[in-house]
């Protein structure tokens, strides 16, 4: 495809893990341990190709006990070697409160602003000319209403499937506007 569309260079991006502060993740780490590993991995990749962009894991979401401190610790160690920090957020309406549910796009906006402040704080502390940007790479309306046990070794089991409503679509639209 690259040749067909006459693209000179392919954008290369590497995620340096996923939700590493989450105990459910294989390879879960404490912030310092993860940040040192991510810093070294990012530097090694960029030695082979300096156009590679790397994404350090932010906290799994803003409700984690690690949120804020995780971002600060990771960026304090790896700020100048990474290009992005990841953000993840999923919302549900378990309470059936439409007004509060639709207002979650405002919470998403605050989440973004908080991570920007942390990035700017670390940049200032380090007197860095480099800017770490945001990679909001996981977000949606998602709830586990159909989170039934799946029989082991079954063929094409239904997993993590939900029925979404117009209300859910409205929040997704508001979240898209927030991202813009």
Residue spans for each PLM region:
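Noncatalytic carbohydrate-binding groove/subsite architecture in carbohydrate-active enzymes
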Residues: 30-178
